Amino acid sequence: MGLVIKLVRHCESEANTGKVNAHEVGDHAIPLSPHGQGHAREVGRALGREYVAGSLLYASPYKRTRETLSGILEGCGLTLDDVAGSYEDPRLREVEHGYEPIESQAELRRTHGWFYYRFRGGESPADCYDRTSSFLESMMRQVERKDTERVLIVTHGLAVRCFVMRFLHLSVEQFDSLANPHNGAIITLADKTTLVDPIFTNDYWGVSGLTLRVGDE
């Protein structure tokens, strides 16, 4: 079947529900909501015990991604000792939004481009792309050393899109067209002939599980 990479956006967090403000508690410390905890177990069952057990697992070190991975393993009836390998990597962290309201920067983002605009005191998607590219190179070396064809990455919505952009060599315009995946969404990169309705493809690879943006969402 060849290499299969599944990326999961963390499940619903307390910031997604509006109960927690990242500026007050620290973005890295935001936990999953009770609904998100249950959803993570459902995601694990959807991925399947066989896939997860045979995978190299990578996760952002943020609390909500750690808890999502824990839920996935619980849903499969597995522990970290049961998988091919497990790693936390700070390069998979959420894009740093800085310390000013995102909404107040919307016009600047439109003017300078969604991909290029750097949040005040934070990062741009282009910055996230650079570190995600570095992660991908490290990951592929580990895949070769471990002699495995399955990878599971638990991360954040923008990091998912940057990873897909780098892996498929998408243009900036194609990146800008991608909607942020839903919480708990499973995105698959694999041989395009094995995927149902891939949204983007190249000569060999395709991606499924992503959708296109509508307006300025």
Please provide the spans of the model-predicted regions.
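Active-site-proximal alpha-helix that buttresses catalytic centers in soluble enzyme cores
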Residues: 2-80, 123-127, 132
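Domain-wide signal for the mature, well-folded portions of proteins, strongly enriched
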Residues: 5-7, 19-21, 38-41, 45-50, ...
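Phosphate-handling substructures
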Residues: 14-15, 30-31, 73-134, 200-201
